[in-house]
Amino acid sequence: MTEYKLVVVGAGGVGKSALTIQLIQNHFVDEYDPTIEDSYRKQVVIDGETCLLDILDTAGQEEYSAMRDQYMRTGEGFLCVFAINNTKSFEDIHHYREQIKRVKDSEDVPMVLVGNKCDLPSRTVDTKQAQDLARSYGIPFIETSAKTRQRVEDAFYTLVREIRQYRLKKISKEEKTPGCVKIKKCIIM
């Protein structure tokens, strides 16, 4: 069974835990309890492949920012979550993305941009703004509602598909790299 290490990042109060718990337990948590760090595991079937999702739900509060580098090192893919009714959380996405790229030392890291709380009428972030940002990053964008469960699975499963593509690209790049010839040596004593 293939394991995928997913990390959910974003500002405090955007619904990272609500999305994760909705996926894992089919339950909406409506009281806000700031997360320090929670880990969840769930076995699912995506495109006919049985997968084990290892999901790290992270702290959005700035006082826990020192912990970010550590979980960013171990994560394979990142759900970058903002709330559609919180412009600041949308603006913060750039900071999270840059930090992920720095820690991973790569421009090419599997990510999905997630606009959560799409069930709310009080939108301050336009869908087109988010689509344009995702397009500029070269990543998918999905609007979700942890409350109604709208596209929650889709967000996580899309990230798994992004990781799969990344893994395949990495393997094919390694196979094409010249100079990867094993040199055999003899030691004469």
UniProtKB/Swiss-Prot annotation:
Glycans are attached at residue 35. Changing residue 12 to C: In lung carcinoma; somatic mutation; also found in metastatic colorectal cancer. It catalyses: GTP + H2O = GDP + phosphate + H(+). A lipid is attached at residue 180 (S-palmitoyl cysteine). The modification N-acetylmethionine is found at residue 1. Ras proteins bind GDP/GTP and possess intrinsic GTPase activity. Plays an important role in the regulation of cell proliferation. Plays a role in promoting oncogenic events by inducing transcriptional silencing of tumor suppressor genes (TSGs) in colorectal cancer (CRC) cells in a ZNF304-dependent manner. This is GTPase KRas. It comes from Homo sapiens. The gene is KRAS.
